[in-house]
Amino acid sequence: MNYKAPRGTHDIFGINASGMSWLEQKAKVIFKRHGFEEVRTPVFEDAALFMRSIGQTTDIVEKEMYIFEDRKKRKLALRPEGTASLVRAFIEHRMDVSMPAGRFFYMGEMFRYERPQAGRYRQFHQIGAEFFGSSSPAADAEIIILAQHLLSSVGINEMNIYINSLGCEKCRPFFRETLVKYLGSVRDLCEDCLRRLEKNPLRILDCKTDSNKFTAVPRMSDYLCNCCKDNFSLTQSLLKSVGYNYTVDERLVRGLDYYTKTVFEIRSDAVGSQCALAAGGRYDNLVGELGGQDTPAVGFALGSERVLLAVQKTGFFGSFQESEKIFIAVADQELFSEAFSFAVKAMRNGLKGNKNISVFGPINGKSLTSQLKFADKIKAVKTIVFARTEFEYGKFLMKNMKDKTQTEFLISEF
């Protein structure tokens, strides 16, 4: 008998295995520079975890999950995505109480019963990051920047960022009601849309079959509450402040039910027509819904095979070393935007040619004393302080966290 890899799976060896290792090493460097720590979770979990978090009416749960029973009749599932498992670990190990401001990344195999095609498999590799404990739009902006930074670091330069706001539990029901009324007037919806109309109408906006029929579809932006409007507006302002171009796509809804407020995709023509290479968004309710302490969060993931197709199997694979932790603080909160821009620049380019660094901060709305305590807690080697007096002379203070000495530097030198 001739045995072959099951349909939708593939063996990775030679240049492809080297490319996978290279991509993962690149990702670790970028994640550590942004202050994220690695977490590894099991490849299978209680099936109910994914049903509860991803959503009973999503395509993943209804059609794509690999579910099985063990010898004790426990219903288990191979993980279809990484966020639910990481949130489960975050709660189980009491990190929602002991370290609610956590930054974590993961990489590993995921499993979905999908139709195999270029860059899409039933067993595939995913790289992702989750930022817990911040409801600030700065966290949304940083996650989008992080995803773009990772893709650009492996040579993908032609890409487009698409963003949207899905609102929250307060304003989304009003949009849902209006959308259902509108969709009820659209004739000849496809089978998937008819099924979603009753269970998950927002997903209809993402339908590739019927999209040309939705000529007068309601706009989510018209139904956002003031809080969601302000959140989305500030996210856009922060992206603009660091020179990031983006497009607001009001039909961008994502395929997972846990998303709230900001969602995004980064698309490229490198693999197919505007194919999504990375995607994510905010999920402020998921930790609480899974039994943890209410904790806002935002994250993203990318498919490794699809990204490697986009970089066309490069033959150069880098190495990485432990990085030096740098914290960015603000003595005057009015300088937060300038400090944020400086932090993003340092994350992208390093400091004076030194790229082996991890950059943390700035923290919005905290006193300088609190920020310095945080710098000590994360064992930062140096803290860069943006203060009004020095900033007016184009300078900042660099504080050595070991001997507490500090030196002034011109911002332009960095």
From Swiss-Prot:
Q: Which GO terms describe its molecular function?
A: ATP binding; histidine-tRNA ligase activity
The UniProt record lists the keyword Isomerase: no
Alphabetically sorted, this entry's keywords are:
Aminoacyl-tRNA synthetase, ATP-binding, Cytoplasm, Ligase, Nucleotide-binding, Protein biosynthesis
Q: What is its EC number?
A: 6.1.1.21
Q: Does the keyword Nucleotide-binding apply?
A: yes
Q: Which reaction does it catalyse?
A: tRNA(His) + L-histidine + ATP = L-histidyl-tRNA(His) + AMP + diphosphate + H(+)
One Pfam match, given by its short name, reads: tRNA-synt_His
PANTHER family per record: HISTIDINE--TRNA LIGASE, MITOCHONDRIAL-RELATED (PTHR43707:SF1), HISTIDYL-TRNA SYNTHETASE (PTHR43707)
Subunit and interaction comment: Homodimer.
By sequence similarity, the record places it as follows: Belongs to the class-II aminoacyl-tRNA synthetase family.
Q: This protein is called what?
A: Histidine--tRNA ligase
The uppermost taxa in this organism's lineage are:
Bacteria, Pseudomonadati, Elusimicrobiota, Endomicrobiia, Endomicrobiales
